[in-house]
Amino acid sequence: AKIALGIYKKIDGSVEKYTNKVGYVPQKMSIDWTLPLRGNDFMILTESLNKETIDEALSLTGVIHLKDKNLGDLSGGEFQRVLLARAISKKPDLLVLDEPVQGVDFTGEIALYELIKKISDELDCGILLISHDLHTVMSATDHVVCLNGHVCCSGSPLDVAKNNEYKALFGEQASQILSRYEHKHDHIHTDEGEIKKN
């Protein structure tokens, strides 16, 4: 993910840059919650955005009503939605989400994952999701890359669940349970990284 974001340079292999339009939601963000920083202010901390762009992003993530509220007064789920709004404000081709539901209650997690799917569909952008939530990873993704200090395995969720390294990491039982998920969608992924409707 950090190579895709341009934070790290590749060590080996090749990386082909597809787009400069990448949105990012970090796992953790350090903010002094005592600062009088409103949702609107947060949206323009590092770049200028017009009012329409800000309102559109906050509306899409369902938090337009919070634009004048101090960030310190927001719940974990509300703050994640503001972070997501900031990440999609430039209509990215790729959205990198690092543990996007951390600090969010279970009901909020479900709502956030549904929102992420909606954003992907509406903006027609790819999602690179970093998560330790095996249920979500195996049930709601097209392609899984399993890391444990190195790439253990990658492929469709069903292929990964059958992989011996995956089984060694998570156990045969987890592999059998998670391999029951089938991801159905109305599109295909080309070798060039494009998505085409069936």
Can you describe what each PLM-predicted range is?
Residues 91:
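Conserved catalytic motifs of ABC-family nucleotide-binding domains
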Residues 131-132:
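H-loop/switch region of ABC-family ATPase nucleotide-binding domains
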Residues 162, 169-198:
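ABC ATPase nucleotide-binding domains
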Residues 144-156:
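H-loop (His-switch) and adjacent beta-strand-loop-beta switch element
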Residues 51-66:
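Conserved ABC ATPase "signature" region
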Residues 70-74, 78:
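Conserved ABC ATPase signature
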Residues 95-99:
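Catalytic Walker B motif of ABC-type/P-loop ATPase nucleotide-binding domains
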